[in-house]
Amino acid sequence: MSGNDEEFNDEFLLAIDSIETTLKKADMYRPLPPPYLPTFLPAPPPSTKISSSLSHPMQLQSSAGQQRKQIQVPDPFLSYSPPRELSQRVVSGFNDALMDYSNSTVVTAAKPISPTTSNRRCDSEKDLEIDRLKKELERVSKQLLDVEQECSQLKKGKSKETESRNLCADDNRGQCSTVHASKRIDLEPDVATSSVNHRENDSRMALDDKRSFKTTGVQADVANHSDLSKKLLDIWRTSNYQDPRKNLISELLLACSTDLQILFSFMKISTPPQELNKQEAKTSSDRQSSKALESEKVYQLYSAVTKISYGFVNLKTLVEPLLDLCKAETAVLVHRSLRVLHVLLEHICGDEKRFEASWDANWHSLFKLMNQIASKRTEQDVKQEALSIMNIIVMSTDAYTARESFVSKEVFESISLLLRKEGGLHVRKEAIHLFYLLLNCPKLYDTFDSLHEEKNSSDTENDSEGNFFALEAFGKIFEGLADCLTSPRKTSEDLELCRNVIMILALAASSGNSGYELLSSHKLPQDSSFLMLILHLLVAEIDSESTEFHPKAEIFKARTLLMREILILLNRLVSGLSSSATILKELTTSRDMASLTVDAATRLSRKRNLLGKPESSVERMRNTEIMDLARIFKKRVFAFLGDNTI
């Protein structure tokens, strides 16, 4: 029985071996099933042994100690090297190949992974990573586009703000370089804001790559910065309304810095010497008291300048100490005070007209004070400044209503004295300007026109005191004007002075018969008349022009303008219906007058040869306008003489 059992066992083993062989052969020719691996593998028991490296095979042992086949796990990182942030992610193939440690059961069997399945899985993983990279690229591109749009908006805002600042910029063209540097820093707030915002955004993106560029946050930062910039601009930039007192201090410091410095230096008082006799001590004491009084006046001026700079007081507080200093004995104090007062009145009569008046000026008393200073002081610079202030006062008043009130006997006497040679060129110029402004008053102009009837009237009992005063005053002034025409003419200012006199004579001639009589028959010293003086002046300048080959530009211009004014006056006199016969008769009544008239008209009507020199605007005036005026005058004179040939 035992023998039969052994044979049965042998046959049973052979049958099992043949079945296994047949199954193996069938597995070899069977087509591969679709790739499938369990999602999770059970965790091995404590006796299970796993290789430490993923590239080595894993060994699984059962509790019975039977040897199992080794499972080769492919390395999912051998085919490519993805980015760092992607490589930290767990790959699905790796999860499939490994086990889930949450389970405690042992995987008893695992199907081998074929090379074809591994390649397909790697291709699918590559496609997924490519899609993921495309999405990342789209996100970064969108973020970059948002940044570019923000930059363009910032640039547009900067250009608009720059244009608005350029429109508001005012001339305050005496600012120091420190203020200009501060303004320049403030003019570019958007650039600094843009760079700060970009740095903040870069730091935020470095901390969190998933955080995108926030447009709303940037706009809020720009708005906050623009508010701060607007506040700074309100401090630095000129506003629509400014207190004229603040502008006044800046103008005084710019135009009168030297004058104020000299004035403030008089605040120091030296003590009198102690070892002196009584007479010297008394004289020194009187002198010291005078200096102390002047120093006190200067200190009041200093206090007024300080207070008005802070807006505590009005302009009257500044004018009063200046007027007190104008009455001082020291010539330097008077001159410097007049210069500061000159700038102050220019500010009041100019800029302050746009604002509320801060000083109720008594122009008549101020005009009277300046007239006294101009007539009594001997210094030419003091006289000039006083006359300049008088001209400012007259120009600030209305010619039809208020200008007549400034005319007085004292004013006309001062003008006649200031027109003398001893006064100097600049004093004469200011006096002529003052007389021209007063003569432009319609009422005074009518008074000058009525002198012709009053002078021809033999009944002196009917002459009023005012007309007699006007006749005498005008006579002295016109004698001073005639003296200006005979003075030497060496500079352009001398020629300009003569031109101003010709303009006054032209204004007087347009008044009527009195003006024509003034020019033709008014007897001047040395038995001359204004017509003779004018012709002598014109011929003398023609001779000077012909002898100077390369005259200075300013002298040539002043001479050309003088010739033009003389020819305009002569043409007006010889063309008037009521004056032409009288003037032409006076021009040709004597041999000397006729010779001067014909010589001047003939020489000026000829065309000058420039000899290839470039023709300037003054040259064009000399060769066209003056030549035409001379030809018209020549035609009138020759027609009166009976010669119609030109």
From Swiss-Prot:
Protein name: Protein SENSITIVE TO UV 2
Short motif (Nuclear localization signal): ranges: 119-126
Cited PANTHER family: ATR INTERACTING PROTEIN (PTHR35761), PROTEIN SENSITIVE TO UV 2 (PTHR35761:SF1)
An example Gene Ontology biological process: response to aluminum ion
Species in which this protein is naturally found: Arabidopsis thaliana (Mouse-ear cress)
Summary of the knockout phenotype: Hypersensitivity to DNA-damaging agents including UVB, gamma-radiation, aphidicolin, ionizing radiation and hydroxyurea (HU). Defective in cell-cycle G2/M arrest in response to DNA damage. Reversed extreme hypersensitivity to aluminum (Al) of the mutant als3-1, including Al-dependent terminal differentiation of the root tip and transition to endoreduplication. Increased tolerance to Al.
GO cellular component, as recorded: cytoplasm; nucleus
Region (Disordered): 42-70
Entry comment describing in which tissues the protein is expressed: Accumulates throughout the root tip.
Compartment(s): Nucleus; Cytoplasm
Chief location category: nucleus
Gene Ontology terms for molecular function: phosphoprotein phosphatase activity; protein dimerization activity
Record keywords: Coiled coil, Cytoplasm, DNA damage, Hydrolase, Nucleus, Phosphoprotein, Protein phosphatase
Similarity comment text for this entry: Belongs to the serpin family.
Biased composition (Polar residues): 48-70
PTMs per UniProt: Probably phosphorylated by ATR.
SUBUNIT field: Forms multimers through the coiled-coil domain.
Role this protein plays: Required for tolerance to DNA-damaging and cross-linking agents such as UVB irradiation, gamma-radiation, aphidicolin, ionizing radiation and hydroxyurea (HU), cisplatin (CDDP) and mitomycin C (MMC). Involved in cell-cycle G2/M arrest in response to DNA damage. Required for aluminum-dependent gene regulation and root growth inhibition in an ATR-dependent manner by halting cell cycle progression and triggering loss of the quiescent center (QC).
Positions marked as site (Reactive bond): 579-580
Chain ranges of the Phosphatase tensin-type domain: 376-646
